[in-house]
């Protein structure tokens, strides 16, 4: 749900590319004026070595990477291991997590390197692949959130018009990926590597950028306007309308498909107006009302969680979407003098895109009791697994020691028993009476 693209968005291109490098070109117009050692020191100091605030950025990216990867994998595992969690909504949530894992693994590291060094180091092939995967994951996320909103809208506002099933959800997920892979093919076609300072191409790969190359000025403007509308503005407006109606149904009105308003159901259950018939009828009515209240509360919790997911998604992708339109459509930031401010805005916007991937599992943990229980169980298993392994080693050590002691004791006892047996036998023999003048040994 974002007008974010890789080449423009965090992931895979130098947001400060050409216009911002104009200020740095002057020292390199005559590179022969500098020896190689001085030149490399300058590049290291100005472009490669992270500045103080960039160390903060690196720490932020590392935190997001770990949380996004671990959290989204746990979401997938939780739904896979528990059949009771394999609902239509959870299937879509798993698909959203898979898209987040994809963008975290493939695009986040490249984005961090580009934001710090302002250079594309990964070659022509990855210049096409990584931005393409970024836009595919964005499209998958948008379409998945749209399907979730549509599914909830039908289930709550029009339950008799369409029945959602797990099979339909799986088919929808397959269609989402196919459509996303097809409509983002132009992104891979137009991405090309180029150097901003051709005179330095033989000395360093710095100032190499991965950017779009169009045949005319009108095409990128049309493309980015359509991209913004299709992947951000239009889906966002439709989802907001859907959730507004869901909110009205769940919090302000009766859910269609139920027998009557809950408050009305309680009237015949009051002591003064209870029927004098069998008590079983009253119990069944109470059970029906309790089940309906439970259903309403469950739907409210789910709707609340999904609204928060949508809100966070919209906030995280809004800055990069606006900056992308301003840059690509209106040509802003081309000759800016305040390069540091522009760089900071783009860098922060890139980080927000990835922070959204880390935020979703946190939202599930706080707003979904089932996911929270599964996350706790997963962490408990990890902690208990380490604890059990330590206990097993200690137990094996104690068992081995006790076994040796037991074996020694048994051998010692066996020797003692043997000696005692010999004494008993000899004593018994010595006390036997002599027969016919024969001694005891003869009788034996």
UniProtKB/Swiss-Prot annotation:
Pfam families assigned to the protein according to its UniProt record, in alphabetical order: 7tm_1, Orexin_rec2
UniProt cross-references to SUPFAM superfamilies, sorted A to Z: Family A G protein-coupled receptor-like
Spans annotated as Required for response to orexin-A: 33-49
One GO term of the biological process aspect: feeding behavior
UniProt xrefs under InterPro entries: GPCR_Rhodpsn, GPCR_Rhodpsn_7TM, Orexin_rcpt, Orexin_rcpt_2
Chain ranges on the Extracellular side, renumbered to this chain: 1-54, 111-127, 192-222, 327-342
Consequence when changing residue 54 to K: In narcolepsy; autosomal recessive; loss of function
Presence of keyword Transmembrane helix: yes
Localization (cell): Cell membrane
SS bond list: 127-210
PROSITE patterns the UniProt entry points to: G_PROTEIN_RECEP_F1_1 (PS00237), G_PROTEIN_RECEP_F1_2 (PS50262)
Site residues, Important for responses to orexin: 44
Domain of life: Eukaryota
GO MF annotation terms: orexin receptor activity
Positions glycosylated per UniProt: 14, 22, 202
Alphabetically ordered keywords of this record: Cell membrane, Disease variant, Disulfide bond, G-protein coupled receptor, Glycoprotein, Membrane, Receptor, Transducer, Transmembrane, Transmembrane helix
Bias type Polar residues, positions: 14-27
Residue stretches spanning the membrane: 55-75, 89-110, 128-150, 171-191, 223-243, 305-326, 343-366
Basic and acidic residues composition bias: residue spans: 1-10
Pathological condition linked to this protein in its record: Defects in HCRTR2 are a cause of an autosomal recessive form of narcolepsy, observed in labradors, dobermans and dachshunds. Narcolepsy is a neurological sleep disorder affecting animals and humans, characterized by excessive daytime sleepiness, sleep fragmentation, symptoms of abnormal rapid-eye-movement (REM) sleep, such as cataplexy, hypnagogic hallucinations, and sleep paralysis. Cataplexy is a sudden loss of muscle tone triggered by emotions, which is the most valuable clinical feature used to diagnose narcolepsy.
PANTHER family: G PROTEIN-COUPLED RECEPTOR 15-LIKE, LEUCOKININ RECEPTOR-RELATED
Function of the molecule: Nonselective, high-affinity receptor for both orexin-A and orexin-B neuropeptides. Triggers an increase in cytoplasmic Ca(2+) levels in response to orexin-A binding.
Comment field on protein domains: The N-terminal region is required for orexin signaling.
Protein family (similarity comment): Belongs to the G-protein coupled receptor 1 family.
Name of the molecule in the record: Orexin receptor type 2
């Amino acid at each position: 749900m974002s007008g974010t693209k890789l080449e423009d968005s965090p992931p895979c291109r130098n947001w400060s590319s050409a216009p911002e490098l104009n200020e740095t070109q002057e020292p390199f117009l005559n590179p022969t004026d500098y020896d190689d050692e001085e030149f490399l020191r300058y590049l290291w100091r100005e472009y490669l070595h992270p500045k103080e605030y960039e160390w903060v950025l690196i720490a932020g990216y590392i935190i997001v990477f770990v949380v996004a990867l671990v959290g989204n994998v746990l979401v997938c595992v939780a739904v896979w291991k528990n059949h009771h969690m394999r609902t239509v909504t959870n299937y879509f949530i798993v698909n959203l997590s898979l898209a987040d894992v994809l963008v975290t693994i493939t695009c986040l590291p490249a984005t961090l390197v580009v934001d710090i060094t302002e250079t594309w180091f990964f070659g022509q092939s990855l210049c096409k692949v990584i931005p393409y995967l970024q836009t595919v994951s964005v499209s998958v996320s948008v379409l998945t959130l749209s399907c979730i909103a549509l599914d909830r809208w039908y289930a709550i506002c029009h339950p008799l018009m369409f029945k959602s099933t797990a099979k339909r959800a799986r088919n929808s997920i397959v269609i989402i990926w196919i459509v996303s892979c097809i409509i983002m093919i132009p992104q891979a076609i137009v991405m090309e590597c180029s150097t901003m300072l051709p005179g330095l191409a033989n000395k360093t790969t710095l100032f190499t950028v991965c950017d779009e190359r169009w045949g005319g000025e009108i095409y990128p403007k049309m493309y980015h306007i359509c991209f913004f509308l299709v992947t951000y503005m239009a889906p966002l407006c439709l989802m907001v309308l859907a959730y507004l109606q869901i909110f009205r149904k769940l919090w302000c009105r009766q859910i269609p498909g139920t027998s009557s308003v809950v408050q009305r159901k309680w009237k015949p259950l009051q002591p003064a107006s209870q029927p004098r018939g069998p008590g079983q009828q009253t119990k069944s009515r109470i059970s029906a009302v309790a089940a309906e209240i439970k259903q309403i509360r469950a739907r409210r919790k789910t709707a609340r969680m999904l609204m928060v997911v949508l809100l966070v998604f919209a906030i995280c992708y809004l800055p990069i979407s606006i900056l992308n339109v301003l840059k690509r459509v209106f040509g802003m930031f081309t000759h800016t003098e305040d390069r540091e401010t522009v760089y900071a805005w783009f860098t922060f916007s890139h980080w927000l895109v990835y922070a959204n991937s880390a935020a979703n599992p946190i939202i599930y943990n706080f707003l979904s009791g089932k996911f929270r229980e599964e996350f706790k169980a997963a962490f408990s298993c990890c902690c208990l697994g380490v604890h059990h392994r330590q206990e097993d080693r200690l137990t094996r050590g104690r068992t081995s020691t006790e076994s040796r002691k037991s074996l020694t004791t048994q051998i010692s006892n066996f020797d003692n028993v043997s000696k005692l047996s010999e004494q008993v036998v000899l004593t018994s023999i010595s006390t036997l009476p002599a027969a016919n003048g024969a001694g005891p040994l003869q009788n034996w």
